[in-house]
Amino acid sequence: MAEVVSFYGYHGYVNQRELQFVREEELWEYLGADLVLVGRATDVLSLPKVQGVRMMELERGDVLRRQPETAEEAEAHKGWAKVLLTDGRTGYVRDVALEPVKYEMTAVFSQREGLAFNDALAETLDTTADKLVPEAVARWYGGSEDAFRAAVCEQAKRYMGTEYRWGGKSGRGIDCSGLVSSAYMQCGVLIYRDAKIIEGWPMHEVAFENKKPGDALFFPGHVALYLGEGRYIHSTGAAASGGVVINSLEPSDPLYREDLVKCLYAVGSIF
């Protein structure tokens, strides 16, 4: 087994035989990808039309680098993006399945210096840790906290119906913290991957009565995303759900989960 660390600061172990080792400059190139897949599952085709040969299937969250095209090619291929795959091949993906990457993936190099994640990311972006969230919100949402919160909730809803998979972080299966951290990531803010609040990351505890849409609700070993009006979205392994569903904090709501309400112990916010 090999110990690995993801670009969002998550440590784990992988069977070494499943890894492909590359030079650091190749990794830098990959981490400079400018597009992220937002469709649940999307084919990469050999041609910019549905008759193209299927080269591979990608999942939500996969990143790609757009390849340059001439003005004539771009016009002829309207509705499609020419992308570079990790194996060096190029293919085509529908534009509607892609969005700009809103998060920075190179802080992993600064983490080698022993910096906390926020400090490592700030060093990479040539800023300070306290400015990470305001700058992300300013860049992608015009400085509007409400717009950011709404976007996080919408990103989480895209996973509705996805089955629960412990350790999962894709449209094929996702766990509770995978759902919440992915929703934030797609909106430009990297939070801690597990179901807890720790120092060195953007999220901090706020009073329950101050919770707003987009905040995180913490239970022992579990986390959900608050949607507003008493409802929250989460990925749960409960037998009655088995995936991403919406439940409620309100006893009068048919989606009420009393077992979770009783053990809710913290609300987390990045604001």
Residue positions per predicted region:
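Boundary regions of SH3-family modules and the immediately adjacent low-complexity/disordered segments
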Residues: 1-2, 6-40, 49, 53-57, ...
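Short, flexible surface segments
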Residues: 54-62, 212-213
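Well-ordered beta-sheet/strand-loop patches within structured domains
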Residues: 111-113, 117, 144, 151-165, ...
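Second-shell loop/turn segments in exported
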Residues: 138-143, 163-171
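Active-site nucleophilic cysteine motif
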Residues: 156, 168-187
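...with weaker cross-activation on analogous glycine-rich loops/strands in unrelated enzymes
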Residues: 189-252
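Low-complexity, Gly/Ser/Thr/Pro-rich intrinsically disordered linker/tail segments
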Residues: 250-271
